[in-house]
Amino acid sequence: MMPLRTGLTYVPSVDWVHESDHPESPERLLTTWEAITRSGILLRASIELIEAQPAGRDSIEAVHVCLPEFDAIATESPRMAAGALLALADAKISGRVSNGFALIRPPGHHANRITLGTRGFCVLNNIAILVQHLRIKHRLRRIAIIDTDVHHGDGTQSIFWNDPDLLFISIHQDGRTLYP
């Protein structure tokens, strides 16, 4: 039996910045990456770093219509975040790794099919791009997404609303209580 290996990909997108005190900031990932590095986890033979490449236009356009134009919307940071997921999924499906963890930003679950710009700090729906990649490249059909975030993954839900082969579960704050 092959030993379990975990694929790890990291895209901090330090150029994707809101106000200095905004919670969705590069510091969130930089701090986490620093803790992972200090802990020695990266030295374990069971960890494999997976290099991210920007998601290609075909992968993005399998999900999104970018207005006013593709390059104005699909900039490097969101393309790298989506591409990291694609690389990690390819590594898993090829058997190179057993599972994976993607430490990426910007987030994506608020982005709808038609993308006019940032919506809830999301430009491209990373997970929707991944789903279409899995279907097109790897011929996977039935897929489940479990979105755990303080906010509802409304963009992902909207994209897959009429898809009978996709189960979408969003566990989020209801507004009357603390998360969840």
Show the residue positions of the predicted features.
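HDAC/HDAC-like amidohydrolase catalytic core signature
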Residues: M1-P180
